[in-house]
Amino acid sequence: MLYRSLIALIAFLAMVPAAMAAEWEEGTHYRTLSEPVETRSGDQLELAEVFWYGCPSCYSMQPVIEEWKETKPDDVNLRHVPASLRRDWAPHAKAFYAARQLGVVDGIHSELFDALAGERRDLNDVDAIAAFFEEQGVAEASEVRDAWGSFAVDTAMRRGRQFQQGAKVTGTPTLVVEGKYVISVRAAGSYENMLAIADHLLEKERSGD
């Protein structure tokens, strides 16, 4: 009796991943791009997170993203793409790229979310953002201004816009898997579902299905 129960349990557990995968339907929970967008993760699979620092939903999703990162497969790169869907979002996108240019993303990413989405601080131009970086102790204001006006940051902004346009991103947060599949929170139903669908699609790419 115990043996048969154990066999039944093993069979059930084997069916769980397939059943979960069957729940995620193309056109309902995610969409496939007719023309894939460029990935920038080398030999790794790419999960791109399109976000805006002032977005309450993106802010709420961050703990879910952080938890996912703890068990992220080694062959997957999480790429951050700051949204510039509106003109007033552009300074915040540029803040991310300036931070990346200075090598201080890890020291300012959460703090920018706290300030813009959490506290609704008025950080809408280079002077305010440079002062904020200095306030957080991650860079001198002059360093931020230099990075802000650099060719590298301008190029990153242009590529980010091209990525968003190519993926037909209309809101945040949005996930783009391997430049091919687009997942919105509205379609997925929750932040946790977004990442579950992303994991399903990453496995699909990994297996070549």
Regions found by a protein language model. Give the residues of each.
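Short, contiguous strand/loop micro-motifs
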Residues: 52, 82-83, 116-117, 147-148, ...
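Extracytoplasmic/secreted envelope proteins and their assembly/folding machinery
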Residues: 62-69, 92-96, 109, 126, ...
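C-terminal cap of thioredoxin/glutaredoxin-like
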Residues: 135-209
